[in-house]
Amino acid sequence: MSLFRRGETWYASFTLPNGKRFKQSLGTKDKRQATELHDKLKAEAWRVSKLGETPDMTFEGACVRWLEEKAHKKSLDDDKSRIGFWLQHFAGMQLKDITETKIYSAIQKITNRRHEENWKLMDEACRKNGKQPPVFKPKPAAVATKATHLSFIKALLRAAEREWKMLDKAPIIKVPQPKNKRIRWLEPHEAKRLIDECQEPLKSVVEFALSTGLRRSNIINLEWQQIDMQRKVAWIHPEQSKSNHAIGVALNDTACRVLKKQIGNHHKWVFVYKESSTKPDGTKSPVVRKMRYDANTAWRAALKRAGIEDFRFHDLRHTWASWLVQAGVPISVLQEMGGWESIEMVRRYAHLAPNHLTEHARQIDSIFGTSVPNMSHSKNKEGTNNT
């Protein structure tokens, strides 16, 4: 029998019906269990070769293969998070047994993970201080969250069918398309009010975001070696950008002023905390430390004090883009400044500056044969007649 051991783990090694050699760890230290797995694998290989059956694959096996083949993905951590959710429902299940009904049933149970994490921190803090922790109430996940999880399992099962030949037919999964929400942006006076309500270092981060349009992760992870103050430029490396392309950032005077205030705070990171804080477990954090891009407590407090609602940090990027478009910056230039991969992603700002369409809109005037008088002039004339 082609069964051997390396260290304490048993391995299977045998020749497949097509003449190829099969060798695989059986993942067990027990010889009897290893023998059973060996015989099962050998029998399955014979059925696949002689009877044309599709080999069985567990959901865990598919996930492991996916992670191995997609190891280069920048968003691999996102895939791992989605795998974690689906494993709660399909662990130990054969791919062929995963149906559309089971998938849709599982996705309805997904909840807002950030909401749960925040509650756990609150619960831990309350218990430590001898207080009664709040009752946890699950918060439904957003449509966009459900869509990304469905897109992942759809891609995984398609790969199992089309690439790995481990599935006869993948389930047909319809992914909901989140509605395009309006672009949320601030008027200059609102932005100034928000900045005034922010405390350092958040204040500098917000100012820098409004002056450069950079994403929060790019700002928080910005290093001094990525900045040339003399040339007034900064750059985001390809592996740091969403589009996987390097982004050159032209630094205006506002951005340079913000950067100069950060000089001397840290040898590596541009934006850092300079005061110690108490962690949920009661320990103290270092006085000078890198900022967290997912810390929202100070941000939410500043929004509340400024009286600004329905506004995310990423909307600062929308605000920056909206201001530039309204100032006459061409869409193509904005695309390059913001590092967007396609022009389609920038067109959502085009409606904010329709001035280039005015000449075309005037073609209707020729149909009526008359020009419309200036509205302000008409109002003045009416006021004179009434007098």
From Swiss-Prot:
- Record keywords: S-adenosyl-L-methionine included? no
Presence of keyword DNA-binding: yes
- GO BP terms: DNA integration; DNA recombination; establishment of integrated proviral latency; symbiont entry into host cell; viral genome integration into host DNA
Domain of life from the UniProt record? Viruses
InterPro entries, per database record: CB, DNA_brk_join_enz, Integrase-like_cat_sf, Integrase_catalytic, Integrase_recombinase_N, Tyrosine_recombinase_XerCD
Cite the EC number.
2.7.7.-, 3.1.-.-
Start and end residues of each Core-binding (CB) domain: 57-161
- Residue numbers annotated as active site: 215, 242, 314, 317, 340, 349
**Residue ranges occupied by any Tyr recombinase domain in the UniProt entry:** 181-362
What UniProt keywords are attached to this protein's entry? DNA integration, DNA recombination, DNA-binding, Hydrolase, Transferase, Viral genome integration, Virus entry into host cell
Q: Which GO terms describe its molecular function?
A: DNA binding; hydrolase activity; transferase activity
Q: What job does this protein perform?
A: Integrase is necessary for integration of the phage into the host genome by site-specific recombination. In conjunction with excisionase, integrase is also necessary for excision of the prophage from the host genome.
Family per UniProt?
Belongs to the 'phage' integrase family.
Q: What is this protein called?
A: Integrase
Gene that produces this protein: int
